Amino acid sequence: PTLYERALEEAETFLKPGPQDRLVDLYCGTGTTLRRWLDSGARVMGVELAGEAVECARLNASEAVLLRGKCVERIPQLTAWLNEGGDWAGRRLLYVNPPRTGLEPEILAWTTDVARPERIAYLSCSAGTLSRNLAVLTESGYGVERITPYDFFPGTRHVETLVSLRRLGTV
């Protein structure tokens, strides 16, 4: 497998999505990750801004609920989807692969105060924004379980980092 596939395998092993779970995938790109979560049986919602990527995601993961636009503009729909049907036996899970700017403050607040996923897999391409985002998440009740660097671009100074976080007090 490629390094990217290994990173996704690690994320999936940590998240352990299943048929009872709802998984939100922010900055979902062309749907590669959506397909993976769907194949695990989870209910999946993705958000992506880029139009061509959204069209590819619709082809790659047609069963997923897919929203086009900025993640911050889709907070109402994300919240409604997570809450639809009232109580259910499954978990809330979050996978994010944001741009170099990291997670927007509104997305961080939504994550920690509204969505409150049991587990987060965060794939980052910027150590600086990752550090700032992790400070907020850990101050808000999340513990870092594992940090794995991936050299997707050998010969450059760019390193992708996968961080596995668990909400404190959850299994």
Model-derived features with residue positions:
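Rossmann-like S-adenosyl-L-methionine
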Residues: 1-171
